[in-house]
Amino acid sequence: MRRSAAALAALSLLATAAVLDGTEAPAEAAPLDGASVVPLQVTGDPSERFNLVLLGDGYTEEEMPLFREQVDQHLNVQWSIEPFRSYRNYFNVYLVETPSAESGVDCDPAHGWERRDTALGMGFFNGCDESALERLLTVDSSAANAAADMVPGVSANNRQILALANSETYGGAGGRLATASSGNALSALISPHELAHSLGALQDEYPYYFRDTSLGRYTGAEPASAHHTLMSSERMLDEEAKWWRWLGEESESGGTIGAADPDGHEGGLYHSEDVWRPSNHSMLKTLGYYFDQVGREVMTHRISGLRDRATLPVSSTPEGEVGAEDAVWVEGPHPVHHELDYTWTVDGEELTDASGARGLELAGLDLEAGARISVRVQDPTEFVRDPDIRASAAMTRTLTWTVGESLEPVEAEAGFTRHRDTERAVSATEVVYAETTRPTDRIMEVAWELDGSTVSTSTDGRTLDLGEFDLPAGDHVLSATVTDPEGSGSQTLTWTVDATAPSAPRELSEAAATVAGGEHHLYLNEFSMRLSPEDDGEGHVVGEFRVDGDGWHHYYGWPEDSEAPFRFTPDGTNVDDLVYGSLGSGGLSMAVFEVDSHEPGWGTHTVEHRAIDSAGNIGSPESFTATVVPGAELECTETVSGAVNGGLRVDEGVVCLDGADVRGKVTVTGGASLVVEGGSLRGGLSASGAHTVRLSGTQVSGAVSISGTTSEVTLLGSSLSGALALNDNTQVPADTWSGEASGYGPVLAGNTVRGSVACSGNNPAVTDFGAANDVTGSVAGQCSDL
C-alpha cells in the first residue's frame, strides 16, 4: 500500500519511515560547493550492481570524521542482516560528502525552531512546517539527486539514496530517497527497512496507520503482497500459493511461520484484523528484527536480479561463434558465503570435470564445427525454495556459443581484474574471489596459500572457501597468485583473515537475588541490559540479543538514548506510542493497542546475546536466565545493617535489613513488614500475621515459619538451612501486576532449602514463576510441585 507523503505525514516514523516518499523540503539548499565522492565499496561496474549512495547534511568540514563514523555504523548494521550479509558483494556503496556551513539541520526539536545553513536543506517537521509531524525529516530532493548524480555511472534506476541528518533526534522518511537522523539509536535500522521497500517491493506489516490507531478490519481481496494473505495454511498448501513452502518453519525473525489460522500472525498493511503475515515480527513490522524467510526469499531474488532489471549480472565471452582452439569464460557475481553453480555442456552432454569452472579451454575437447557449448550459471542458495524464482533470469543464466570462426586474438598479461578488496579483513567463513585477465586462447592459473600452505577448494582456483578450514582464532594470511601457463608474468594478492570471533559483554541491572550456581538472576518487576560489542579489528561491531529463542534483535541501547541500557518489563515500556522491551507473548516491540491481546511476560526467560564484527564473523552466543516477579515498592521506616546480636523483633512499620548479620531469631508480629536484602539470619525466622515478608539473597540458619501474612510473602534466591513452613498466607497482587485478575500466591523462587518444605492454606497457592527451588528434604502440600 503506497500513499503520498502528505497523506502519511502523521505516520509513526519509528516504524513507518520507509513508507514515505522522499519529499522535497521547502528550505533552500546551499550550492554543492566542495562536494566529493568517496567510493566505500566497489565490487563491479555500476551497471552490474545495485548502488547505495549515502549523503550527509548538517556536517561541517570539521565534522566529516563524525559523518564517516556514523556511516560505518549504518553500513555494518546493514551487512549484519541477511540477505545483505550474504549478498554484500552485489552492492556498490558510495559516500558523497557535502560539507555544510553550519552544524545541524532545520527545526530540530532539540534545538528549537532554528534554521541552519546546510548543503542539502534537510529539516524536521517536513521542512519546518508547523502542522507536520516533527519526526518527518525531509531533504531538498533536487540537491540530494544532484549530489547522487556526482557518482559516475550511477543513475536513478539503479541506486538507493540515504541522506543522513546530523542530529540525535529521531526522524526519517522513505522511498528511493530515504532520510534518517544519524545520531539516534534506531536510525541505522531505517536503511535495511527502506531497502525492503525500494529494492524488494515488500510492504509494511504494521497493524496500525497512526501508531496508536489501527485501520481495523481488512476488507479487501487476497493481497498482491508476497507476504500478506487471507488464506489458511490448509488452503495455501492445497493451492501451493504464497509462502506454502515455508509453512511450519521456525522463523528467522521469531516464532513459527504460519498463515490465516487461529495461531497465525494477524495484522498487516496497517490493519489489525483479517489479514495475516508469515511471522510474529520481522523488520517489516518491528525495527530491529531480521527478515523472516518469506521476505528474505523475495529480497534475495530482487538483489540477485538488480531490482527491476530482473537479470543476474553475468559477464562472458560474447555469445556467438568461437574457434575450436579458443577459451571461453563466464563470470557471475560473488556471494559472500557460498558460490554460484557453473554447469558446462557440449551438445547437451554435461562436462562433469568442468563443473564449477568459470572458463573452458576448447582445444582439448576435439570439437567439430557447429558444436554447441553452453554454461548454466545458477545461484543454489538455501534462501530460495520457489523453483520458479530459482529458474528466473534473476538467479539463473544460460550462455551458448557455437564452434565456428575463431575469436579475434586478445593477449593479456597474467593479472587480477576484480577481486575481494584487500583493505578489509576477510571473515573466517568467507568465500574469497579473484578474477583474472582473459586471453582468448588459454585460462590463467591461480594458486592459493593460507599461512604459507598451499590450499584449494574450487575447480578453477578463482575462489577459496575459508569455511572449509575451521580456522583457529587469530589472524591468518591468505594469498592468491595468478600465473600464465604459457608465460612468465604473475601477480599476487594478500588478505588478512580475521578468525577471532567478536563478543558482546553484558552489564545487567542489579538483581534482587541470584540463583546459586549459575547465571540465573531474580528481579522485581523489571531488569535492564547493556551490551558493549567488541572485537580486535577495526569497524563498528554490531550487538544482537534474543529472548526465549524468539528471533535475534539488534541492540541499539534504548530508543531515546543509544547510551542507555535496554529495558525489559513484562508488558514493555511505551515510548512515543510504541512499546519496547516487552517480555510478553507478542515479542519485544509492538503497537500500544496490541499489548492487551498478549500474555504479559512475568516469570522466567532466557536471554542470549552475541556480536557481529565488520569482517562478518558472528560470535558464539552467551546467555543468562532472568526471572521477573511482581513486587510493590516498599518505603522503609527503619533500615538495619551490620551485625545485630540477640535477634530482632519487628512489631510495626517496614523494617529493612540491608546486608545485616542477625545473630538470633527474627520475629515479625501482626501488621509489621520485614524486607531483607542479602545478609544472614542466624536463628531462623517466625512471622505471624505480618503485612509483608520479603527475603532476597539471604542466608537463613534455622527454621522459617511464615503464616497469616495479609499482603505479600516473597522468598527469592535465598539459602535456607532448616524447615520452611508457609501456611494460611494471603497474597495481594502488587500494583505492578498485569496478569490474570486471580493474581498469584506467595512467591518461592530460586531458593535452596536444606530441610523440609510444607505449604498449606495459602491464597492463591504458592508459585515459583518458573524458577525452581532446590530442596533436599520432604516437600508437602501446595509446594509439592516447586
Please tell me what each predicted stretch does:
Residues A30-A148, S182, F383:
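Propeptide-to-catalytic entry region of secreted or membrane-anchored zinc metalloproteases
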Residues P318-V330, E382-A447, S453, L466-A632:
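Low-complexity, disordered linker/stalk regions enriched in Pro/Thr/Ser/Gly
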Residues L195-R211:
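Catalytic Zn2+-binding segment of zinc metalloproteases
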Residues M64-F67, G171-P192:
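Short pre-active-site segment immediately N-terminal to the catalytic Zn-binding motif
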Residues P630-L786:
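Extended beta-solenoid/beta-helix repeat architectures
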Residues M1-A29:
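Secretory targeting and sorting signals
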Residues G348-L362, G452-L466:
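Surface-exposed, flexible coil segments in extracellular/virion-facing regions
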